[in-house]
């Protein structure tokens, strides 16, 4: 029996998550809630994507429904999770992709509406199980965990690298810089924003801003709390980002050892298919539509004075992330059967 899935927020993450897992046997997508544009816009943007191209299935709107190859998904336009009659649609699992509801208090209404599990496509500010697939998904306990977060795209890129280096060499401390594409938290032209740098036109500048990806690693490796920090630089591109990791490790190492550790990890469980390893001189566009979370740029690995390590990791910050989120959804769905 398939687990019935609803999506709240049908923007970049919501639409791509549906694309990624539409034909998976464990999941049945039954409802979409999106406050902007109605079913017509939802269907159109699901079919036609400026970054990821046309989706193969036929997609159309019919009244308050979206049809995918003739299969209907009901559609609503409510502003809050507790306004959506999830129980009427038989939804077991919600993918919360709006980016607006990120605390247990604002997410609790789902459970009052009969939803069994909620996976948030963003870090949750208070207690929730923070899962990075391939790194700590073994922590999921079906009877205990009902609210989960798939962390952030950059945390999903960084965590596999930290796992390999920390478990193989030991990390004393480190700083990361994510060179990250534009997102819809920015503005096309100058406009008011609480982050004055994000208030500036996205297409004209490199924009330093914050990222919580490095500090979030402490949720997975508590011994690294206060030992990692980072910054983001938003760049005028639409897809494929790069994480620049600098670590001080606990023992002497070499470029060859670092790359060997990362390559070996990419070829076996639990990181196979999640961590990649690349020796060709590729650039960001080559990683568009790559489903992996983190791809090592082996040509760029550096070691200085035996213990300072620099690693570059590419990632499709949209497609790679949603693939991990729906893999988490599948893991959760299997626990409900």
Curated annotation (Swiss-Prot):
PROSITE patterns: GAPDH
Catalytic activity: D-glyceraldehyde 3-phosphate + phosphate + NAD(+) = (2R)-3-phospho-glyceroyl phosphate + NADH + H(+)
InterPro entries named in the record: G3PDH_Arsen, GAP_dehydrogenase, GlycerAld/Erythrose_P_DH, GlycerAld_3-P_DH_AS, GlycerAld_3-P_DH_cat, GlycerAld_3-P_DH_NAD(P)-bd, Glyceraldehyde-3-P_DH_1, NAD(P)-bd_dom_sf
Sites marked Activates thiol group during catalysis: 180
Catalytic EC class: oxidoreductase
Record-level GO BP terms: gluconeogenesis; glycolytic process
Annotated catalytic residues: 153
Subunit structure: Homotetramer.
Protein name: Glyceraldehyde-3-phosphate dehydrogenase 3
Organism: Nostoc sp. (strain PCC 7120 / SAG 25.82 / UTEX 2576)
């Amino acid at each position: 029996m398939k687990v019935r899935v609803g999506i709240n927020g049908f923007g970049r993450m919501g639409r791509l998550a549906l694309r990624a897992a539409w034909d998976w046997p464990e999941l049945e997508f039954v409802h979409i809630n999106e406050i902007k544009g109605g079913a017509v816009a939802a269907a159109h943007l699901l079919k036609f994507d400026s970054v990821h191209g046309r989706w193969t299935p036929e997609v159309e709107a019919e009244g308050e429904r979206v049809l995918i190859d003739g299969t209907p998904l009901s559609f609503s336009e409510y502003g809050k999770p507790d306004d959506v009659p999830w129980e009427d649609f038989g939804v077991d699992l919600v993918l919360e992709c709006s980016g607006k509801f990120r605390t247990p208090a604002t997410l609790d209404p789902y459970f009052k509406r009969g939803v069994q599990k909620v996976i948030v496509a963003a870090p949750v500010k208070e207690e929730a199980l923070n899962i990075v697939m391939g790194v700590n998904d073994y922590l999921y306990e079906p009877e205990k965990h009902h609210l989960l977060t798939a962390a952030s795209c950059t945390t999903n890129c960084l965590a596999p690298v930290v796992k390999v280096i920390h478990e193989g060499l030991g990390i004393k401390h480190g700083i990361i810089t994510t060179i990250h594409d534009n997102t819809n938290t920015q503005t096309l032209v100058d406009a008011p924003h609480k982050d004055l740098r994000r208030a500036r036109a996205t297409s004209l500048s490199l924009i330093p801003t914050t990222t919580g990806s490095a500090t979030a690693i402490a949720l997975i490796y508590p011994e690294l709390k206060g030992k990692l920090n980072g910054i983001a630089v938003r760049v005028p591109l639409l897809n494929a980002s790069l994480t620049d990791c600098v670590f001080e490790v606990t023992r002497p190492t070499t470029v060859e050892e670092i790359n060997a550790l990362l390559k070996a990890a990419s070829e076996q469980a639990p990181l196979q298919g999640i961590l990649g390893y690349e020796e060709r001189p590729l650039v960001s566009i080559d990683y568009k539509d790559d489903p992996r979370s983190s791809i090592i740029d082996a040509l760029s690995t550096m070691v200085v004075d035996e213990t300072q390590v620099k690693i570059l990791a590419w990632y499709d910050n949209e497609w790679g992330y949603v693939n991990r989120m729906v893999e988490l959804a599948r893991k959760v769905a299997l626990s409900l059967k």
